[in-house]
Regions:
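Formylglycine-dependent sulfatase
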Residues: 1-172
Length: 172
């Protein structure tokens, strides 16, 4: 397998030798997107909550946190997230509120790859195209996000863009 672009990134990129990863995904996601310790943004543990349910138990990253997507968008980049957000489901705390102009995926921790339901507790449907809840039962979620990401890259191939593709598969 030839990977010239990946090889170039490895040869010319930055190596982080003094970094850590939290034991659960939310704090690591917050650190990756903000470049700051996740506690500063209120992300100390695993966040969960249904956007369409009660928000009394929703944990969310503080919306005042500045994300990589916000900085790049201000610099003229198109910004998109395909897949998992998991930094807050409450309105005002989603990816479209934190610098991404496009989001296709889920807001909570993980969803079933065919029903697109979050399966902890009572469970709830969690699949969105931007802020619109969509239903595509029976379609394989990893393929859906790849297809959407490829379409986005083709549409914006003549301009700079930052695309984050966050797969759900590590949870299954």
């Amino acid at each position: 397998l030839q990977t010239p672009y990946m090889d170039s990134l490895a040869d010319n990129g930055v190596s982080f030798t003094q970094a850590y990863a939290h034991t659960v995904c939310c704090p690591s996601r917050a650190a990756l997107l903000t470049g700051r310790h996740p506690n500063r943004g209120g992300v100390q543990s695993w966040l969960q909550g249904d956007r369409n349910g009660s928000d009394t138990h929703l944990g969310n990253m503080d919306p005042s946190e500045i994300t990589l997507a916000e900085v790049l968008r201000e610099a003229g980049y198109r910004t998109a997230l395909f897949g998992k957000w998991h930094l807050g489901a409450k309105f005002g705390h989603g990816p479209l509120d934190q610098g991404f102009e496009k989001h296709f995926g889920h807001l909570s921790g993980f969803i079933d790859n065919f029903t697109h339901y979050f399966l902890h507790g009572q469970g709830y449907h969690d699949l969105y195209d931007n802020n619109e809840e969509i239903f595509r039962r029976g379609e394989y979620f990893p393929e859906m996000i790849v297809d959407e990401a490829v379409k986005y890259a083709a549409k914006h191939s003549d301009e700079p863009f930052f695309m984050m593709v966050a797969f759900n598969l590590p949870h299954y």
